[in-house]
């Protein structure tokens, strides 16, 4: 990525961010350029992704400045967000003043400190300069009179596509015309919804399929098709030729490719994801750029060569002078009385203290306020082991922020101990449910599955289940087939109208009852028989990954997970592994509400597999030999936390011992109250909701079943911290559902491997989730996906606004906004708090270069709490 300073004159230059571009072949060039976009997963397996994951070698500030310059995208919170947060008490003014003093101390300037501070204090109010001042003849005349001051110049380092510089006779920008064509070809090639008519030659790749059809495209003019008639057969040759004919010098080609990738980051992100899934499509990004830039050449060729194509940008001094007049209280007369050196110093200072710098200081003050509030909340004094209350059940929940309120209310209502662990429970598996031919990678998307686990049933019971499932699927298949067929699609409304009309009326007016009826009907009809898993290792050459586990692998995964949460002794009679899932209707983003650690799927499958492994005699015997002795009367069970309705659904309960049965009954007895309290807390945070809720659980079910409900739950909005430590650190704290919680006992981690594993796995997932919510909040027009009510699900891949927009990569407006003008999510970078001695943190940072880079470059924040309870910011 090419990030260059905004001006070249030394007095106005910001921190040098030049990155040299060396000669590379086209593959390397495209690979380097691809860092500016993030892979985009299909919406059916919606995985939180960090939009700047390829740019972490640069600082957050550098990337923010580059995006502002290259795409006019602001990734700092807006002034309205900052003012709102300050009004709510989320930003302490003292932290802003500390930040300003540090910034002033770091700068070299030759104006009185008092003058600089006065200017900064006024500028930090984030008021816009009045348009009347900026356009005043007096100001512009003053700017002309002192124009002899050389403010420097710059080349357009972002290398905007040439098409973006041209308008056709209709007044349409040619980049919009180009995007229209590219969206069409991407939809045709990437379509994953089983269209009746697929793109011809699709199996040969995007470029060759496009090359075969482009000369017949009626949307292009005759001259445009003529340009592409004898175009190279291979993508690399086409891309090289197009860049040459457009006159893009080799030194600027990477930046030019970046500009094109950023023009449609959603479609380009989906292309990049596909290129990473198979060897067959590994050159897909090159093919995409070859198609795009070849078409750009055809469209812009009549306008070439452009006049002033390489014109340099000048830094306008008008807003710089205006800022000193408005914020620094310097009149035009005083300006004229200054020497050129004094004027230059003032302009340089105003330039350095730009909008991004001001918002950066506000963001850091906001983050420091949150850290200080969290520091005051959490208890740093761990209870002595013998002071712990006797527990009858231990429940392990996903680290998901939605688990925190549920765990808190559960612990208050009974003798229960809860743990936090990544919801895939450390099992790198691909799951295949009963009767399915497809497997799902049920683990974080940053990992690859190593084992395939299939759900199995008795042959006779399975046949009966399969028949019922075929009846259910045949109805859906028939409807979809009729819908796609040219003739039957005209008959379908007449046939299905009355039934669908009745469904629409009942779904709209009595959603909870109808939704519950349909759900129960399908549940009874498709009731699974008793199932088991293919846990034992089977060598199958037809499978890419082995089925099941060896004995050593079973023991290893159980040991690893138990040690990770510090559960190696004092087992309760009942240990429950709790995955989590969501429940909503008519929601394209359903996968976004599922378990991120399970690749956008429910976590129950993993929970059940892990609990089953823990109950195996062979596993217990091996663990006992290693010192992890699980009592005979301790039973592992599995459940699923339904986050939309805050209920616990049992999915695996083996035969229980007497003590375990007592614990089970205890959990069942308090669960209605837990659900009531958790639902009440969660529902009152939804906008325009009545503060007095007679029956919170009933209301939660209505939200889950109502197909017109745009916000069935807040998901992971307002997430802000990831706390790694023992439960005692946070047990009595109301963390407001804003913290990822992962158990960790540094005393059982002498070499630091467990901590390193938590940071590399769950820590990375939490960071991706955090930055996706951050990006969708601060730049919803670029990194979000707009309003849910106007979205179109396209090609089985994702959503668009209308039928000719980018493939929208982020979260919808309803996931982060409370109203048109007020945000719900607080855009703060993730604060990772680790409960461990200082030497553990130092070792982690020394050994994990990637994590150290994230901390140093401002992509995450880091703090620690040592054994004496001392808090340290890193």
Swiss-Prot record:
Cofactor(s) it depends on: Zn(2+)
Lineage: Bacteria, Bacillati, Bacillota, Bacilli, Bacillales
Binding residue positions for Zn(2+): 398, 400, 580, 595
Subcellular location, record wording: Cell membrane
Membrane topology: Peripheral membrane protein
Family classification: Belongs to the inorganic carbon transporter (TC 9.A.2) DabA family.
Annotated protein name in UniProt: Probable inorganic carbon transporter subunit DabA
Role according to the record: Part of an energy-coupled inorganic carbon pump.
Cystine connections: none
Gene Ontology molecular function: zinc ion binding
GO cellular component: plasma membrane
Quaternary state and interactors: Forms a complex with DabB.
Main location: membrane
Keyword Cell membrane included in the entry's annotation: yes
Species name: Bacillus cereus (strain Q1)
Pfam name, any one: DabA
This protein's UniProt keywords: Cell membrane, Membrane, Metal-binding, Transport, Zinc
Database matches in InterPro entries: DabA
């Amino acid at each position: 990525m090419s990030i260059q300073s905004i001006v070249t004159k030394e007095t106005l230059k910001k921190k040098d961010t030049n990155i040299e571009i060396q000669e590379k072949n086209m593959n390397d060039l495209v690979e380097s350029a691809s860092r500016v976009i993030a892979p985009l997963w299909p919406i059916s397996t919606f995985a939180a992704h960090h939009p700047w994951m390829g740019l972490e070698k640069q600082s957050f500030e550098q990337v923010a400045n580059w995006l502002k310059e290259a795409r006019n995208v602001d990734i700092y919170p807006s002034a309205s967000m900052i003012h709102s947060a300050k009004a709510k008490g989320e930003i302490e003014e003292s932290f802003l003043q500390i930040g300003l003093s540090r910034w002033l101390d770091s700068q070299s300037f030759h104006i009185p400190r008092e003058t600089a501070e006065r200017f900064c204090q006024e500028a930090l109010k984030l008021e816009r300069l009045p348009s009347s001042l900026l356009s005043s003849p007096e100001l512009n005349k003053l700017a002309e009179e002192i124009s002899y001051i050389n403010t420097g110049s710059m080349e357009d380092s972002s290398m905007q596509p040439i098409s973006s510089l041209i308008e056709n006779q209709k007044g349409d920008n040619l980049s919009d015309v180009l995007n229209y064509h590219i969206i069409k070809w991407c939809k045709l090639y990437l379509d994953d919804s089983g269209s009746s008519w697929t793109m011809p030659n699709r199996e040969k790749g995007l470029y060759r399929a496009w090359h075969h059809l482009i000369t017949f495209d009626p949307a292009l003019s005759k001259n445009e098709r003529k340009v592409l008639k004898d175009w190279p057969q291979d993508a690399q040759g086409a891309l090289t030729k197009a860049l040459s004919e457009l006159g893009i010098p080799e030194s600027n080609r990477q930046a030019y490719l970046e500009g094109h990738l950023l023009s449609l980051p959603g479609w380009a992100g989906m292309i990049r994801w596909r290129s990473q899934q198979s060897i067959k499509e590994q050159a897909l990004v090159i093919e995409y750029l070859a198609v795009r830039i070849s078409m750009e050449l055809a469209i812009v060729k009549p306008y070439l060569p452009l006049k002033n194509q390489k014109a340099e940008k000048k830094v306008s001094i008008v807003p710089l002078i205006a800022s000193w007049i408005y914020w620094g209280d310097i009149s035009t007369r005083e300006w004229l009385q200054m020497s050129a050196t004094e004027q230059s110093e003032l302009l340089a200072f105003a330039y350095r203290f730009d909008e991004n710098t001001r918002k950066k200081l506000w963001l850091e003050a906001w983050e420091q306020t949150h850290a200080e509030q969290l520091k005051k909340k959490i208890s740093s004094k761990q209870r002595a082991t013998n002071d712990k209350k006797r527990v009858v059940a231990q429940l392990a929940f996903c680290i998901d922020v939605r688990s925190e309120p549920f765990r808190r209310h559960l612990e208050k209502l009974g003798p229960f101990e809860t743990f936090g662990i990544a919801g895939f429970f450390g099992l790198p598996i691909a799951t295949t449910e009963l009767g399915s031919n497809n497997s799902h990678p049920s683990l974080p998307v940053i990992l690859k599955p190593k084992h395939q686990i299939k759900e199995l049933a008795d042959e006779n019971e399975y046949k009966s289940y399969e028949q019922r499932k075929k009846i259910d699927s045949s109805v859906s298949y028939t409807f979809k087939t009729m819908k796609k067929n040219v003739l039957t699609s005209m008959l379908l409304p007449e046939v299905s109208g009355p039934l669908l009309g009745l469904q629409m009326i009942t779904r709209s007016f009595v959603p909870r009852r109808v939704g519950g009826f349909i759900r129960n009907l399908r549940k009874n009809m498709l009731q699974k028989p008793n199932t088991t898993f293919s846990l034992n290792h089977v060598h199958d050459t037809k499978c890419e990954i082995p089925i099941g586990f060896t004995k050593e692998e079973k023991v290893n995964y159980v040991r690893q997970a138990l040690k990770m949460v510090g559960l190696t002794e004092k087992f309760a009679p009942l240990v429950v592994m709790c995955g989590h899932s969501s429940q909503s209707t008519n929601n394209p983003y359903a996968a976004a509400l599922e378990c991120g650690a399970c690749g956008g799927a429910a976590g129950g499958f993993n929970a059940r597999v892990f609990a089953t492994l823990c109950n195996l005699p062979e596993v217990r015997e091996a663990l006992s030999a290693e010192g992890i002795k699980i009592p005979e009367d301790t039973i592992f069970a599995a459940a699923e936390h339904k986050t939309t309705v805050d209920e616990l659904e049992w999915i695996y309960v083996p035969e229980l011992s007497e003590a375990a049965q007592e614990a089970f009954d205890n959990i069942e007895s308090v669960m209605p109250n837990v659900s009531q309290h958790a639902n009440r807390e969660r529902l009152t945070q939804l906008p325009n909701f009545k503060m007095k809720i007679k029956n919170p659980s009933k209301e939660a079910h209505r939200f889950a079943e109502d197909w017109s409900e745009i916000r069935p739950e807040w998901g992971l909005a307002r997430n802000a911290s990831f706390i790694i430590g023992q439960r005692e650190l946070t047990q009595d704290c109301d963390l407001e559902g804003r913290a990822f919680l992962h158990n960790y006992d540094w005393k059982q981690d002498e070499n630091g491997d467990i901590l390193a594993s938590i940071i590399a796995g769950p820590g990375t997932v939490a960071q991706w989730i955090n930055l996706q919510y951050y990006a969708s909040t601060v730049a919803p027009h670029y990194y979000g996906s707009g309003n849910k009510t106007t979205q179109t699900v396209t090609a089985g891949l994702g959503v668009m606004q209308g039928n000719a927009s980018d493939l929208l990569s982020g979260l919808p407006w309803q996931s982060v906004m409370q109203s048109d003008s007020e945000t719900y999510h607080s855009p703060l970078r993730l604060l990772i708090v680790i409960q461990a001695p200082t030497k553990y943190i130092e070792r982690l940072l020394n050994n994990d270069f990637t994590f150290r880079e994230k901390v140093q470059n401002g992509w995450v924040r880091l703090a620690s709490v040592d054994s004496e309870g001392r808090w340290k910011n890193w």
